[in-house]
Amino acid sequence: MDSFSTSIWVNDVTVRYNNGHTAIHNMTFSLNSGTICALVGVNGSGKSTLFKSIMGLVKPQQGEIKLCDLPISQALKRNLVAYVPQSEEVDWQFPVSVYDVVMMGRYGYMNFLRIPKAIDKQKVQEAMQRVNIEHLAHRQIGELSGGQKKRVFLARALAQQSPIILLDEPFTGVDVKTENAIVDLLQQLREEGHLILVSTHNLGSVPDFCDQVVMINRTVIAAGKTEDTFNQHNLEIVFGGVLRHIKLLGENLHNDEDKRSVTVLTDDEKAVVFYGETKQDPPAPTTQNCHFEDCPYKSAVKNKRD
């Protein structure tokens, strides 16, 4: 990872648009290498604006952002941050191959003629192999499924060889197999020292692979280790009435001996389940995945849904 200290440092950042709308206000947090962090918030909470600010596309009116201890302009020149979009606003009928799209990740290393060198071709090949799309290299990207396109954009980011990777809703429009493959890759990248910031509304997946969480609603509501931060109290503050909120008691569950209280917060994709110790106790701030089709409590959950 070169000699840079891989980090994201956001200090007292405020962004206002020309119409007077304040997208983010006094936002402060920091992240270091070897981390997968979930950026969690409702639509309109400032997630996209924060990503644009980190990428240098939006300039804050107040505060400062540094990447690897460098101002954004210098960090971008050094290819220190890569971005994996939720989708690309392009004409999918335009004839461009998967190989060419992944090669775009090498543009920052080329001169204005953009003639790839041997090292560029090598890194593109390695990136495609890592996300298992080498067999798609000569396909037109417009022919691919949503999940395949997502892997192409991820390969492009890998080809860029950036220590910081931003991913915007990487699990939207992908099947379970692709989601699991993406999670496995992100965990490998974390072990290699990358810093990965993932914007997501798929709450049920967060405890699976994210060791840090930044929860926002135009400002930082909570930030820290997942086990300390990703809890019922903070989720209710961040999401308010957006999520369904179901509270069950042990006697309503399949196991008659299980008298723990259960609180379910769900956006109807994957639920986050909080367990109390007894039916009298409030739910403890621990999490477990619960997909309605797989959860042992699914009957009780479905019967109690609003």
Curated annotation (Swiss-Prot):
Transmembrane portions of the chain: none
Q: Could you tell me the superkingdom of the organism this chain comes from?
A: Bacteria
One GO cellular component, as annotated: ATP-binding cassette (ABC) transporter complex
Question: Example GO molecular function term?
Answer: ATPase-coupled transmembrane transporter activity
Q: Show the InterPro entries listed in the entry.
A: AAA+_ATPase, ABC_transporter-like_ATP-bd, ABC_transporter-like_CS, Metal_Ion_Import_ABC, P-loop_NTPase
Q: Could you tell me which residue ranges the ABC transporter domain spans?
A: 8-243
Q: Where does ATP bind?
A: G41, V42, N43, G44, S45, G46, K47, S48
Family in the record: Belongs to the ABC transporter superfamily.
What is the purpose of this protein? Part of an ATP-driven transport system HI_0359/HI_0360/HI_0361/HI_0362 for iron. Probably responsible for energy coupling to the transport system.
Name it.
Probable iron transport system ATP-binding protein HI_0361
